[in-house]
């Protein structure tokens, strides 16, 4: 079994996450959004990404792609990294239908706050592939984020702590940090892995890891290179610097 897992890093990482229910990590995993081509995904993995995220959508989200491109990315990545699919949709059936051809390792739910109840997430779990884990986004605007994280922790596999912005649908992609003291309290109080997002960059991720001690860290905005006002690609040098800085923090 151990030998097989050495050849399947994606499964090994997921086993480490869910079997041991680590809510902190000596070396945080690195999640990078958002992949727009297979080549970009492979480059991010080579630069240090453990989890790679895609945004299959037609809502005008940053870096969104269609389902066919998302499938191509996941097929190319295969077991080289944990494959994450993000959705801001609010209809359970629509989400399940969208995920059916993708079969992500992790489904990242980030519709607006209070869209779903824990019971609805349980219903969604019954509609998707049983091997797909669920990551629930919590907007850390104030201390009410703690109550939300505690309410959803029993029904999901990960919590991701992010920062909302009124200009983008759902939770995240703001490029702004939030109160890391609240995030640290959530990490300490829930019994599932917590990924810290929201304005993280190569310059501040080490301080974030030191302050919060999350299971993982996530970056979108500050590892991009803009080719026009609303069009970006991943800046692989920034991804590499982000991953290195996150992992350089002393345990």
Segments from the language model and where they lie:
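Short, low-complexity intrinsically disordered segments enriched in A/P/G/S/L with frequent Arg
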Residues: 3, 8-10
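Conserved N-terminal beta1-alpha1 strand-loop-helix module at the mouth
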Residues: 16-123, 130-167, 171-196, 200-216, ...
């Amino acid at each position: 079994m151990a030998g097989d897992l050495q050849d399947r890093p994606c499964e090994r990482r997921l086993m480490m996450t869910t079997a041991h229910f680590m809510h902190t990590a000596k070396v945080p995993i690195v999640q990078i959004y958002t992949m727009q081509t297979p080549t970009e995904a492979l480059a991010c993995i080579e630069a240090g990404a453990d989890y790679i995220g895609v945004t299959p959508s037609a809502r005008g989200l940053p870096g969104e792609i269609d389902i066919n491109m998302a499938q191509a990315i996941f097929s190319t990545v295969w077991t080289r990294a944990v494959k994450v699919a993000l959705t801001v949709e609010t209809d359970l059936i629509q989400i399940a239908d969208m995920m059916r051809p993708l079969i992500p390792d992790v489904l990242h739910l980030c519709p607006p706050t209070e869209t779903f109840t824990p019971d609805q997430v349980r219903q969604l779990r019954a509609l998707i592939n049983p091997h797909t884990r669920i990551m629930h986004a919590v907007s850390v605007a104030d201390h009410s984020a703690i109550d939300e994280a505690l309410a959803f922790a029993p029904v999901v596999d990960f919590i991701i702590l992010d920062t909302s912005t009124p200009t983008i649908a759902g939770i995240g992609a703001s490029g702004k940090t939030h109160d890391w003291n609240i995030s640290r309290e959530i990490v300490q109080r829930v019994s599932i892995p917590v990924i810290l997002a929201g304005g993280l960059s190569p310059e501040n991720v080490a301080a974030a890891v030191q302050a919060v001690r999350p299971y993982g860290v996530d970056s979108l905005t500050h590892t991009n290179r803009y080719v026009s006002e609303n069009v970006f690609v991943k800046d692989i040098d920034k991804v590499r610097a982000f991953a290195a800085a996150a992992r350089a923090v002393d345990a």
